[in-house]
């Protein structure tokens, strides 16, 4: 009995540290990109997955101590997939005292009617879902739309575009929507997926599976995700450094003539970003730049096992 109590205390200690880390990361992203302003009404897109649950809880937590006042409204799109547990989110949100709206649209039927059997449905489904969420944001008077993409999603998107799209394009923490009417924010932009996964498991959120539509998995994204997870295990700090690189772009040392005026370089031009080192190799640090191991990672890794043992 005493051993179980000690494990429970350790779990709570680790959970508190994890929550503080997520709060810190979300708060920093909000500050860096001016995501939330005085009087904002944030539409939090809630899918029933670990990311959106975590985003909602951290935003509610920050709301209590934020220097600006803002409101939150959770929105879920019920696309009428067979077997969708439509009672889960309303019950959870009412229990938490969160303002919410469930939007019911049979996009599943439209997609099944338009897309031949065996073909991936993700593209059409995504367009339909996006349009409905934009419309809902307008109806609710939302000034910002919050999505639950995290740091790993952003890096995956960067590599997907590099490997398959031939462009260096990631997923922005904040940007105007494609219809030009809404500001989309990603408060989890600085958060690690493994932190979110641990937090969601400890919180025991009522997770809704994401495979209800029966669509084919995005194999390209899966390959990229596996690659990044492998790197994270084999080369600690690499993921953090790659994300830092997205925040430290040097256009003069790339090849995009739209970003830098290569044609305008003449004798007497200013030396930019250290200039060209010619035959000298770039001075690369032995350890990933700016990376420091999280002191409590090993303890957090034990948290999942501890929770299982207590139960």
UniProtKB/Swiss-Prot annotation:
Matching SUPFAM superfamilies: Adenine nucleotide alpha hydrolases-like (SSF52402)
Catalytic activity reported: cytidine(32) in tRNA + S-sulfanyl-L-cysteinyl-[cysteine desulfurase] + AH2 + ATP = 2-thiocytidine(32) in tRNA + L-cysteinyl-[cysteine desulfurase] + A + AMP + diphosphate + H(+)
Gene: ttcA
Note: The thiolation reaction likely consists of two steps: a first activation step by ATP to form an adenylated intermediate of the target base of tRNA, and a second nucleophilic substitution step of the sulfur (S) atom supplied by the hydrosulfide attached to the Fe-S cluster.
NCBIfam families: PRK10696.1
Record carries keyword Ligase: no
Predominant location category: cytoplasm
Gene3D superfamilies: HUPs (3.40.50.620)
Biological process according to GO: tRNA thio-modification
Record EC number: 2.8.1.-
Keywords linked to the UniProt accession: 4Fe-4S, ATP-binding, Cytoplasm, Iron, Iron-sulfur, Magnesium, Metal-binding, Nucleotide-binding, RNA-binding, Transferase, tRNA processing, tRNA-binding
Name of the featured protein: tRNA-cytidine(32) 2-sulfurtransferase
Family under the similarity heading: Belongs to the TtcA family.
Binding positions ([4Fe-4S] cluster): 122, 125, 213
Positions of short motif PP-loop motif: 47-52
Originating organism: Enterobacter sp. (strain 638)
Subcellular location: Cytoplasm
GO cellular component term of the entry, any: cytoplasm
Protein purpose: Catalyzes the ATP-dependent 2-thiolation of cytidine in position 32 of tRNA, to form 2-thiocytidine (s(2)C32). The sulfur atoms are provided by the cysteine/cysteine desulfurase (IscS) system.
Pfam families per record: ATP_bind_3
Family annotation (InterPro entries): Rossmann-like_a/b/a_fold, TilS/TtcA_N, tRNA_Cyd_32_2_STrfase, tRNA_thiolation_TtcA_Ctu1
Cofactor info, note text: Binds 1 [4Fe-4S] cluster per subunit. The cluster is chelated by three Cys residues, the fourth Fe has a free coordination site that may bind a sulfur atom transferred from the persulfide of IscS.
Needed co-factor(s): Mg(2+); [4Fe-4S] cluster
Record HAMAP family: TtcA (MF_01850)
